[in-house]
Curated annotation (Swiss-Prot):
The keyword Cell membrane does not apply. This is Cytochrome P450 monooxygenase lcsI. CDD domains: CYP60B-like (cd11058). It comes from the Eukaryota. It comes from Purpureocillium lilacinum. InterPro entries: Cyt_P450, Cyt_P450_CS, Cyt_P450_E_grp-I, Cyt_P450_sf, Cytochrome_P450_monoxygenase. Cytochrome P450 monooxygenase; part of the gene cluster that mediates the biosynthesis of the lipopeptide antibiotics leucinostatins that show extensive biological activities, including antimalarial, antiviral, antibacterial, antifungal, and antitumor activities, as well as phytotoxic. The chain crosses the membrane at residues 20-42. Signal peptide: none annotated. SUPFAM superfamilies: Cytochrome P450. Glycans are attached at N131, N184, N415, N420, N442. GO terms for molecular function: heme binding; iron ion binding; monooxygenase activity; oxidoreductase activity, acting on paired donors, with incorporation or reduction of molecular oxygen.
Length: 516
Protein backbone atom coordinates (compact mmCIF):
# COMPACT_ATOMS: atom_id res chain seq x y z
CA UNK A 1 0.00 0.00 0.00
CA UNK A 2 1.59 3.37 -1.06
CA UNK A 3 2.69 5.68 1.69
CA UNK A 4 1.03 9.00 2.38
CA UNK A 5 4.33 10.69 1.34
CA UNK A 6 4.39 8.95 -2.04
CA UNK A 7 0.75 9.81 -2.73
CA UNK A 8 1.34 13.42 -1.82
CA UNK A 9 4.40 13.55 -4.12
CA UNK A 10 2.43 12.12 -7.05
CA UNK A 11 -0.40 14.57 -6.46
CA UNK A 12 2.05 17.49 -6.31
CA UNK A 13 3.72 16.35 -9.54
CA UNK A 14 0.36 16.02 -11.26
CA UNK A 15 -0.74 19.45 -10.08
CA UNK A 16 2.59 20.98 -11.12
CA UNK A 17 2.34 19.53 -14.63
CA UNK A 18 -1.28 20.61 -14.84
CA UNK A 19 -0.39 24.12 -13.71
CA UNK A 20 2.39 24.35 -16.27
CA UNK A 21 0.04 23.22 -19.03
CA UNK A 22 -2.61 25.69 -17.93
CA UNK A 23 -0.04 28.49 -17.70
CA UNK A 24 1.34 27.65 -21.13
CA UNK A 25 -2.15 27.57 -22.58
CA UNK A 26 -2.99 30.91 -21.01
CA UNK A 27 0.24 32.42 -22.29
CA UNK A 28 -0.47 31.16 -25.79
CA UNK A 29 -4.04 32.47 -25.68
CA UNK A 30 -2.88 35.85 -24.39
CA UNK A 31 -0.26 36.01 -27.14
CA UNK A 32 -2.90 35.34 -29.78
CA UNK A 33 -5.18 37.93 -28.17
CA UNK A 34 -2.33 40.47 -28.16
CA UNK A 35 -1.57 39.85 -31.83
CA UNK A 36 -5.25 40.11 -32.71
CA UNK A 37 -5.72 43.37 -30.78
CA UNK A 38 -2.47 44.76 -32.22
CA UNK A 39 -3.58 43.89 -35.75
CA UNK A 40 -6.94 45.59 -35.16
CA UNK A 41 -5.17 48.70 -33.90
CA UNK A 42 -2.69 48.84 -36.78
CA UNK A 43 -5.36 48.34 -39.44
CA UNK A 44 -8.19 50.50 -38.08
CA UNK A 45 -6.90 52.91 -35.42
CA UNK A 46 -3.22 53.63 -36.17
CA UNK A 47 -2.49 57.16 -37.51
CA UNK A 48 -1.53 55.52 -40.83
CA UNK A 49 -4.84 53.65 -41.10
CA UNK A 50 -6.11 56.31 -43.52
CA UNK A 51 -3.32 55.58 -46.01
CA UNK A 52 -4.41 53.15 -48.77
CA UNK A 53 -2.84 49.72 -48.88
CA UNK A 54 -3.43 46.03 -48.20
CA UNK A 55 -4.54 45.23 -44.65
CA UNK A 56 -2.07 42.34 -44.41
CA UNK A 57 0.81 44.81 -44.91
CA UNK A 58 -0.66 47.27 -42.41
CA UNK A 59 -0.61 44.73 -39.59
CA UNK A 60 2.68 42.94 -40.34
CA UNK A 61 6.04 43.60 -41.96
CA UNK A 62 6.37 39.95 -42.98
CA UNK A 63 4.93 40.42 -46.53
CA UNK A 64 7.49 43.19 -47.08
CA UNK A 65 10.34 41.05 -45.72
CA UNK A 66 9.26 38.04 -47.77
CA UNK A 67 9.43 40.00 -51.03
CA UNK A 68 12.64 41.71 -49.95
CA UNK A 69 14.41 38.40 -49.33
CA UNK A 70 13.13 36.93 -52.61
CA UNK A 71 14.42 39.92 -54.58
CA UNK A 72 10.88 40.85 -55.62
CA UNK A 73 10.36 43.96 -53.46
CA UNK A 74 10.40 46.47 -56.31
CA UNK A 75 7.87 44.59 -58.43
CA UNK A 76 5.66 43.96 -55.38
CA UNK A 77 5.66 47.70 -54.66
CA UNK A 78 4.77 48.36 -58.29
CA UNK A 79 1.79 46.02 -58.11
CA UNK A 80 0.57 47.72 -54.91
CA UNK A 81 0.79 51.18 -56.47
CA UNK A 82 -1.08 49.95 -59.54
CA UNK A 83 -3.86 48.76 -57.24
CA UNK A 84 -3.96 51.48 -54.56
CA UNK A 85 -2.59 54.62 -56.22
CA UNK A 86 0.21 57.14 -55.67
CA UNK A 87 0.60 56.54 -51.92
CA UNK A 88 0.59 53.09 -50.29
CA UNK A 89 1.16 51.84 -46.77
CA UNK A 90 3.55 48.94 -47.35
CA UNK A 91 4.29 48.00 -43.72
CA UNK A 92 2.98 49.01 -40.28
CA UNK A 93 5.37 51.98 -40.14
CA UNK A 94 6.35 52.51 -43.79
CA UNK A 95 4.77 54.43 -46.68
CA UNK A 96 5.74 54.44 -50.35
CA UNK A 97 5.04 57.32 -52.76
CA UNK A 98 5.29 57.46 -56.55
CA UNK A 99 4.15 61.08 -56.91
CA UNK A 100 6.52 64.04 -56.81
CA UNK A 101 7.10 64.44 -53.07
CA UNK A 102 10.84 64.98 -53.43
CA UNK A 103 10.50 68.55 -52.16
CA UNK A 104 8.54 67.42 -49.10
CA UNK A 105 10.89 64.61 -48.09
CA UNK A 106 14.38 65.17 -49.50
CA UNK A 107 14.89 68.90 -50.04
CA UNK A 108 16.37 71.38 -47.60
CA UNK A 109 13.44 73.01 -45.81
CA UNK A 110 12.83 76.61 -44.82
CA UNK A 111 10.26 78.39 -42.66
CA UNK A 112 7.65 76.34 -40.82
CA UNK A 113 8.72 73.16 -42.61
CA UNK A 114 12.23 73.53 -41.20
CA UNK A 115 10.94 73.67 -37.62
CA UNK A 116 9.67 70.11 -37.91
CA UNK A 117 13.21 68.74 -38.12
CA UNK A 118 15.38 66.90 -40.64
CA UNK A 119 14.31 63.82 -42.57
CA UNK A 120 17.21 61.53 -41.66
CA UNK A 121 18.19 58.32 -43.43
CA UNK A 122 16.46 55.23 -42.07
CA UNK A 123 19.47 53.37 -40.67
CA UNK A 124 17.49 50.17 -40.38
CA UNK A 125 18.09 49.80 -44.11
CA UNK A 126 21.86 49.65 -43.66
CA UNK A 127 24.24 47.13 -42.15
CA UNK A 128 25.99 48.35 -39.02
CA UNK A 129 29.46 49.55 -40.11
CA UNK A 130 32.32 47.17 -39.42
CA UNK A 131 34.16 49.79 -37.35
CA UNK A 132 30.95 51.09 -35.71
CA UNK A 133 31.31 54.47 -37.45
CA UNK A 134 28.66 55.64 -39.92
CA UNK A 135 29.71 57.01 -43.31
CA UNK A 136 28.27 60.05 -45.09
CA UNK A 137 25.57 57.75 -46.47
CA UNK A 138 23.97 57.28 -43.05
CA UNK A 139 25.43 60.22 -41.10
CA UNK A 140 23.26 62.28 -38.76
CA UNK A 141 22.27 65.92 -39.29
CA UNK A 142 25.46 67.22 -37.67
CA UNK A 143 28.02 64.88 -39.20
CA UNK A 144 26.68 64.84 -42.77
CA UNK A 145 27.45 68.46 -43.79
CA UNK A 146 30.84 68.23 -42.08
CA UNK A 147 31.77 65.13 -44.08
CA UNK A 148 30.28 66.41 -47.31
CA UNK A 149 32.39 69.57 -47.11
CA UNK A 150 35.53 67.42 -47.26
CA UNK A 151 34.38 64.80 -49.77
CA UNK A 152 32.42 66.85 -52.33
CA UNK A 153 35.43 68.72 -53.81
CA UNK A 154 36.94 65.41 -54.96
CA UNK A 155 33.97 64.88 -57.31
CA UNK A 156 33.39 68.45 -58.49
CA UNK A 157 33.26 69.42 -62.16
CA UNK A 158 36.53 71.31 -61.72
CA UNK A 159 38.38 68.28 -60.37
CA UNK A 160 36.90 66.02 -63.05
CA UNK A 161 38.26 68.34 -65.73
CA UNK A 162 41.65 68.18 -64.02
CA UNK A 163 41.35 64.38 -63.88
CA UNK A 164 40.32 63.97 -67.52
CA UNK A 165 43.70 62.61 -68.60
CA UNK A 166 43.47 59.86 -65.97
CA UNK A 167 39.86 59.03 -66.88
CA UNK A 168 40.74 58.91 -70.59
CA UNK A 169 43.53 56.42 -69.86
CA UNK A 170 40.94 54.02 -68.49
CA UNK A 171 38.62 54.70 -71.43
CA UNK A 172 41.45 53.85 -73.85
CA UNK A 173 42.32 50.69 -71.94
CA UNK A 174 38.64 49.67 -71.92
CA UNK A 175 38.42 50.06 -75.72
CA UNK A 176 41.78 48.34 -76.26
CA UNK A 177 40.72 45.30 -74.25
CA UNK A 178 37.46 45.05 -76.20
CA UNK A 179 39.38 45.18 -79.49
CA UNK A 180 41.52 42.33 -78.18
CA UNK A 181 38.37 40.33 -77.49
CA UNK A 182 37.44 40.57 -81.18
CA UNK A 183 40.80 39.11 -82.16
CA UNK A 184 40.96 36.09 -79.86
CA UNK A 185 38.91 32.91 -79.62
CA UNK A 186 35.85 34.72 -78.27
CA UNK A 187 35.39 36.32 -81.73
CA UNK A 188 34.01 39.46 -80.16
CA UNK A 189 31.40 37.77 -77.97
CA UNK A 190 31.74 39.51 -74.61
CA UNK A 191 29.82 39.99 -71.37
CA UNK A 192 29.45 43.77 -71.26
CA UNK A 193 28.37 43.72 -67.61
CA UNK A 194 31.80 42.44 -66.69
CA UNK A 195 33.68 44.99 -68.78
CA UNK A 196 31.63 47.95 -67.56
CA UNK A 197 32.40 46.81 -64.01
CA UNK A 198 36.11 46.59 -64.77
CA UNK A 199 36.05 50.18 -66.00
CA UNK A 200 34.04 51.77 -63.19
CA UNK A 201 35.79 49.93 -60.35
CA UNK A 202 39.23 50.88 -61.67
CA UNK A 203 38.32 54.56 -61.88
CA UNK A 204 36.66 54.86 -58.48
CA UNK A 205 39.59 53.10 -56.79
CA UNK A 206 42.00 55.53 -58.44
CA UNK A 207 39.86 58.51 -57.44
CA UNK A 208 39.47 57.25 -53.86
CA UNK A 209 43.03 56.36 -52.87
CA UNK A 210 45.12 56.76 -56.01
CA UNK A 211 45.46 53.04 -56.71
CA UNK A 212 43.56 51.14 -59.40
CA UNK A 213 42.03 47.70 -58.88
CA UNK A 214 43.70 46.82 -62.23
CA UNK A 215 40.61 44.97 -63.44
CA UNK A 216 41.09 46.28 -66.99
CA UNK A 217 44.81 45.55 -66.93
CA UNK A 218 44.24 41.96 -65.85
CA UNK A 219 40.92 41.48 -67.68
CA UNK A 220 39.56 40.05 -64.46
CA UNK A 221 37.90 41.06 -61.21
CA UNK A 222 40.03 42.08 -58.26
CA UNK A 223 39.43 39.76 -55.25
CA UNK A 224 37.83 42.65 -53.31
CA UNK A 225 35.31 43.19 -56.11
CA UNK A 226 34.50 39.48 -56.16
CA UNK A 227 33.82 39.59 -52.42
CA UNK A 228 31.51 42.56 -52.95
CA UNK A 229 29.38 40.72 -55.51
CA UNK A 230 29.15 37.68 -53.24
CA UNK A 231 27.74 39.87 -50.46
CA UNK A 232 24.95 41.58 -52.45
CA UNK A 233 22.18 39.27 -51.24
CA UNK A 234 23.44 39.59 -47.68
CA UNK A 235 22.64 43.31 -47.84
CA UNK A 236 18.92 42.57 -48.13
CA UNK A 237 19.11 39.85 -45.47
CA UNK A 238 20.82 42.23 -43.08
CA UNK A 239 18.24 44.94 -43.73
CA UNK A 240 15.40 42.49 -43.12
CA UNK A 241 16.65 41.03 -39.84
CA UNK A 242 17.59 44.42 -38.39
CA UNK A 243 13.86 44.87 -37.77
CA UNK A 244 13.92 41.75 -35.59
CA UNK A 245 16.72 41.96 -32.96
CA UNK A 246 16.08 38.39 -31.76
CA UNK A 247 16.72 36.91 -35.22
CA UNK A 248 19.61 39.30 -35.77
CA UNK A 249 21.31 37.91 -32.66
CA UNK A 250 20.73 34.33 -33.85
CA UNK A 251 22.13 35.02 -37.32
CA UNK A 252 25.22 36.67 -35.84
CA UNK A 253 25.78 33.72 -33.52
CA UNK A 254 25.27 31.09 -36.22
CA UNK A 255 27.11 32.89 -39.05
CA UNK A 256 29.83 30.62 -40.51
CA UNK A 257 33.34 31.62 -39.52
CA UNK A 258 34.45 31.79 -43.15
CA UNK A 259 31.79 34.44 -43.89
CA UNK A 260 32.89 36.49 -40.90
CA UNK A 261 36.48 36.19 -42.09
CA UNK A 262 35.50 37.31 -45.60
CA UNK A 263 33.81 40.38 -44.14
CA UNK A 264 36.94 41.14 -42.13
CA UNK A 265 39.14 40.81 -45.21
CA UNK A 266 36.72 42.89 -47.28
CA UNK A 267 36.96 45.81 -44.85
CA UNK A 268 40.62 45.32 -43.97
CA UNK A 269 41.64 45.69 -47.60
CA UNK A 270 40.09 49.16 -47.75
CA UNK A 271 41.45 50.16 -44.35
CA UNK A 272 44.97 49.13 -45.40
CA UNK A 273 44.78 51.07 -48.67
CA UNK A 274 43.54 54.15 -46.83
CA UNK A 275 46.36 53.87 -44.30
CA UNK A 276 48.97 53.61 -47.04
CA UNK A 277 47.52 56.59 -48.90
CA UNK A 278 47.31 58.79 -45.80
CA UNK A 279 50.95 58.01 -45.00
CA UNK A 280 52.01 58.81 -48.56
CA UNK A 281 53.29 62.21 -49.63
CA UNK A 282 51.81 61.78 -53.11
CA UNK A 283 50.14 64.85 -54.62
CA UNK A 284 47.77 62.67 -56.67
CA UNK A 285 44.42 64.56 -56.65
CA UNK A 286 42.26 61.79 -55.19
CA UNK A 287 39.75 61.74 -52.34
CA UNK A 288 42.46 61.33 -49.72
CA UNK A 289 44.31 64.41 -50.91
CA UNK A 290 41.18 66.48 -50.25
CA UNK A 291 40.54 64.89 -46.87
CA UNK A 292 44.15 65.50 -45.78
CA UNK A 293 43.64 69.23 -46.26
CA UNK A 294 41.34 69.16 -43.22
CA UNK A 295 43.45 66.87 -41.02
CA UNK A 296 44.49 69.63 -38.61
CA UNK A 297 41.04 71.20 -38.31
CA UNK A 298 38.84 70.40 -35.28
CA UNK A 299 36.05 69.23 -37.59
CA UNK A 300 38.26 67.11 -39.80
CA UNK A 301 37.36 63.44 -40.22
CA UNK A 302 38.91 60.94 -37.85
CA UNK A 303 40.45 57.71 -39.15
CA UNK A 304 37.33 55.59 -38.59
CA UNK A 305 35.21 58.09 -40.52
CA UNK A 306 37.71 58.09 -43.39
CA UNK A 307 37.70 54.29 -43.53
CA UNK A 308 33.90 54.07 -43.55
CA UNK A 309 33.56 56.69 -46.27
CA UNK A 310 36.21 55.12 -48.48
CA UNK A 311 34.40 51.79 -48.22
CA UNK A 312 30.98 53.13 -49.17
CA UNK A 313 32.30 55.37 -51.98
CA UNK A 314 34.04 52.44 -53.66
CA UNK A 315 30.71 50.64 -53.90
CA UNK A 316 28.41 53.59 -54.64
CA UNK A 317 30.78 55.06 -57.21
CA UNK A 318 31.21 51.94 -59.32
CA UNK A 319 28.44 49.35 -59.29
CA UNK A 320 25.66 51.86 -59.94
CA UNK A 321 27.34 53.38 -63.01
CA UNK A 322 28.17 49.96 -64.44
CA UNK A 323 24.54 48.98 -63.92
CA UNK A 324 23.24 51.94 -65.91
CA UNK A 325 25.75 51.38 -68.73
CA UNK A 326 24.67 47.74 -68.95
CA UNK A 327 20.99 48.65 -68.99
CA UNK A 328 21.43 51.39 -71.58
CA UNK A 329 23.41 49.07 -73.85
CA UNK A 330 20.71 46.40 -73.65
CA UNK A 331 17.90 48.85 -74.37
CA UNK A 332 19.70 50.38 -77.33
CA UNK A 333 20.47 46.97 -78.85
CA UNK A 334 16.85 45.91 -78.28
CA UNK A 335 15.64 49.00 -80.16
CA UNK A 336 17.55 49.15 -83.48
CA UNK A 337 15.95 52.43 -84.53
CA UNK A 338 17.17 54.17 -81.36
CA UNK A 339 20.59 52.58 -81.68
CA UNK A 340 20.86 53.85 -85.25
CA UNK A 341 19.98 57.40 -84.17
CA UNK A 342 22.58 57.45 -81.42
CA UNK A 343 25.23 55.82 -83.60
CA UNK A 344 24.59 58.46 -86.27
CA UNK A 345 25.01 61.24 -83.69
CA UNK A 346 28.25 59.74 -82.35
CA UNK A 347 29.87 59.03 -85.72
CA UNK A 348 28.62 62.30 -87.15
CA UNK A 349 30.23 64.19 -84.28
CA UNK A 350 33.60 62.43 -84.02
CA UNK A 351 36.09 61.38 -86.66
CA UNK A 352 38.75 60.16 -84.23
CA UNK A 353 38.85 58.95 -80.60
CA UNK A 354 40.96 61.94 -79.57
CA UNK A 355 37.93 64.14 -80.24
CA UNK A 356 35.83 62.32 -77.60
CA UNK A 357 36.37 64.62 -74.64
CA UNK A 358 34.36 65.51 -71.55
CA UNK A 359 33.44 68.84 -73.12
CA UNK A 360 32.47 67.29 -76.46
CA UNK A 361 30.17 64.62 -75.01
CA UNK A 362 28.41 67.23 -72.88
CA UNK A 363 26.85 68.60 -76.10
CA UNK A 364 25.20 65.48 -77.53
CA UNK A 365 21.41 65.70 -77.11
CA UNK A 366 20.47 62.18 -78.20
CA UNK A 367 23.19 60.60 -76.06
CA UNK A 368 21.93 62.50 -73.02
CA UNK A 369 18.34 61.56 -73.81
CA UNK A 370 19.21 57.87 -74.21
CA UNK A 371 21.02 57.81 -70.87
CA UNK A 372 18.16 59.67 -69.17
CA UNK A 373 15.65 57.20 -70.57
CA UNK A 374 17.80 54.28 -69.41
CA UNK A 375 17.93 55.81 -65.92
CA UNK A 376 14.15 56.09 -65.95
CA UNK A 377 13.48 52.51 -67.02
CA UNK A 378 16.35 50.90 -65.11
CA UNK A 379 17.36 53.06 -62.12
CA UNK A 380 20.46 51.56 -60.42
CA UNK A 381 18.78 52.05 -57.02
CA UNK A 382 15.32 50.72 -57.89
CA UNK A 383 13.66 51.02 -54.49
CA UNK A 384 13.41 54.25 -52.52
CA UNK A 385 15.88 56.32 -50.53
CA UNK A 386 14.32 55.75 -47.11
CA UNK A 387 13.80 58.72 -44.76
CA UNK A 388 12.31 58.99 -41.26
CA UNK A 389 9.56 61.58 -40.76
CA UNK A 390 10.79 63.89 -37.97
CA UNK A 391 9.07 65.12 -34.81
CA UNK A 392 5.34 64.64 -34.42
CA UNK A 393 4.74 64.27 -38.15
CA UNK A 394 4.42 66.23 -41.38
CA UNK A 395 2.30 66.71 -44.49
CA UNK A 396 3.68 64.77 -47.45
CA UNK A 397 1.92 64.93 -50.79
CA UNK A 398 -1.27 66.07 -49.10
CA UNK A 399 -1.23 63.23 -46.54
CA UNK A 400 -0.49 63.60 -42.83
CA UNK A 401 2.28 61.16 -41.92
CA UNK A 402 3.14 60.67 -38.22
CA UNK A 403 6.68 61.10 -36.92
CA UNK A 404 8.85 57.99 -36.95
CA UNK A 405 7.31 56.67 -40.17
CA UNK A 406 9.74 55.53 -42.87
CA UNK A 407 8.89 57.15 -46.22
CA UNK A 408 10.35 57.16 -49.72
CA UNK A 409 9.72 57.71 -53.40
CA UNK A 410 9.90 54.19 -54.85
CA UNK A 411 11.87 54.83 -58.02
CA UNK A 412 11.16 51.87 -60.29
CA UNK A 413 7.40 51.89 -59.54
CA UNK A 414 7.27 55.68 -60.00
CA UNK A 415 9.15 55.51 -63.30
CA UNK A 416 6.94 52.71 -64.63
CA UNK A 417 3.61 54.23 -63.61
CA UNK A 418 1.26 55.33 -66.39
CA UNK A 419 0.12 58.11 -64.05
CA UNK A 420 3.59 59.63 -64.47
CA UNK A 421 4.64 58.62 -67.99
CA UNK A 422 3.16 57.88 -71.38
CA UNK A 423 4.27 54.45 -72.60
CA UNK A 424 6.12 53.92 -69.30
CA UNK A 425 7.67 50.57 -70.26
CA UNK A 426 8.96 51.68 -73.67
CA UNK A 427 12.49 52.92 -74.33
CA UNK A 428 11.88 56.24 -76.09
CA UNK A 429 14.70 58.81 -75.64
CA UNK A 430 12.60 61.30 -77.61
CA UNK A 431 10.48 61.92 -74.50
CA UNK A 432 13.42 64.05 -73.26
CA UNK A 433 13.74 65.92 -76.56
CA UNK A 434 10.40 67.69 -76.72
CA UNK A 435 8.37 64.99 -78.49
CA UNK A 436 4.74 66.17 -78.13
CA UNK A 437 3.56 62.62 -77.43
CA UNK A 438 5.13 62.93 -74.01
CA UNK A 439 4.24 66.50 -73.08
CA UNK A 440 2.19 65.26 -70.11
CA UNK A 441 5.04 63.19 -68.66
CA UNK A 442 5.77 64.00 -65.02
CA UNK A 443 9.55 64.16 -65.42
CA UNK A 444 9.85 66.00 -62.09
CA UNK A 445 9.41 62.62 -60.38
CA UNK A 446 12.73 61.47 -61.87
CA UNK A 447 15.61 61.77 -59.41
CA UNK A 448 17.86 58.72 -59.87
CA UNK A 449 20.65 60.49 -57.97
CA UNK A 450 18.26 61.51 -55.17
CA UNK A 451 17.66 65.18 -54.34
CA UNK A 452 18.40 67.83 -51.75
CA UNK A 453 21.46 68.22 -49.52
CA UNK A 454 21.99 64.43 -49.42
CA UNK A 455 21.90 63.82 -53.16
CA UNK A 456 24.56 61.69 -54.81
CA UNK A 457 28.05 63.20 -54.66
CA UNK A 458 29.15 61.21 -57.69
CA UNK A 459 26.52 62.43 -60.15
CA UNK A 460 29.01 64.43 -62.24
CA UNK A 461 31.50 61.55 -62.30
CA UNK A 462 28.77 59.10 -63.33
CA UNK A 463 27.64 61.38 -66.17
CA UNK A 464 31.20 61.78 -67.42
CA UNK A 465 31.86 58.03 -67.35
CA UNK A 466 28.57 57.09 -69.01
CA UNK A 467 28.88 59.65 -71.80
CA UNK A 468 32.53 58.91 -72.60
CA UNK A 469 32.09 55.13 -72.60
CA UNK A 470 28.89 55.08 -74.67
CA UNK A 471 30.40 57.48 -77.20
CA UNK A 472 33.61 55.47 -77.56
CA UNK A 473 31.76 52.16 -77.66
CA UNK A 474 29.57 53.27 -80.58
CA UNK A 475 32.44 55.02 -82.33
CA UNK A 476 34.65 51.93 -82.25
CA UNK A 477 32.18 49.07 -82.62
CA UNK A 478 29.01 47.80 -84.20
CA UNK A 479 27.13 45.84 -81.54
CA UNK A 480 24.38 43.24 -81.49
CA UNK A 481 22.78 41.05 -78.84
CA UNK A 482 23.78 37.40 -79.03
CA UNK A 483 20.38 36.38 -77.66
CA UNK A 484 17.82 39.01 -78.71
CA UNK A 485 15.01 36.90 -77.20
CA UNK A 486 16.38 37.23 -73.67
CA UNK A 487 14.51 39.67 -71.41
CA UNK A 488 17.65 40.92 -69.70
CA UNK A 489 15.74 43.47 -67.60
CA UNK A 490 13.77 40.73 -65.83
CA UNK A 491 16.02 40.69 -62.77
CA UNK A 492 15.88 40.29 -59.02
CA UNK A 493 16.86 43.26 -56.87
CA UNK A 494 18.59 43.02 -53.52
CA UNK A 495 19.00 46.76 -52.88
CA UNK A 496 21.05 46.63 -56.12
CA UNK A 497 20.02 44.76 -59.26
CA UNK A 498 21.27 41.19 -59.52
CA UNK A 499 22.47 41.60 -63.08
CA UNK A 500 22.57 38.78 -65.58
CA UNK A 501 25.46 38.49 -68.06
CA UNK A 502 24.86 40.75 -71.07
CA UNK A 503 26.35 38.88 -74.00
CA UNK A 504 27.08 41.15 -76.95
CA UNK A 505 28.88 40.57 -80.25
CA UNK A 506 31.35 43.33 -81.11
CA UNK A 507 32.50 44.15 -84.64
CA UNK A 508 35.25 46.77 -84.92
CA UNK A 509 34.57 49.79 -87.10
CA UNK A 510 37.66 50.31 -89.23
CA UNK A 511 37.41 54.08 -89.64
CA UNK A 512 40.80 54.71 -88.06
CA UNK A 513 43.67 52.81 -86.48
CA UNK A 514 42.46 51.11 -83.29
CA UNK A 515 44.25 52.00 -80.04
CA UNK A 516 47.53 50.18 -79.57
Amino acid sequence: MPSIHASTSELFTHLTVSNICVAAGCAFALSLLYLYVRALYLVFFHPLSRIPGPKYAACSRLPYVRNQLRGDLVKWLHSLHQQYGDVVRIAPDEVSFISNVWQDVYAAHNGEKATKGTYLKDRRWFAAPYNNTWSILQADAEAHPRMRKMIAPAFSDKVLREQEAMIQEYVELFVLRLHEQTENDSKGDVDMVKWFNFFTFDIIADMTFGESFNCLRDSDYHPWVRMLFKSVRAISLNSAIRRYPFFQAIVKRLAPKNLLEQRRQFNQFVFDRVGERLASESSHPDLMSHIKKFKDEPKGMNRDEIDSNANILLVAGSETTATLLSGCTYMLLSNPEKLAKLTKEVRGTFNHPSEVTIKAVSNMPYLHAALSEALRIYPPSPAGFMRIVPGNGDMIGGHWIPGGTSVSVSQWPANHSDSNFTMPNSFVPERFLGDPRFEKDNTSVLNPFSAGPRNCLGKSLANVEMRLIMARLLLDFDLELIDPEQDWLDQKSFTLWEKLPLMVRLKPVRRYTAPA
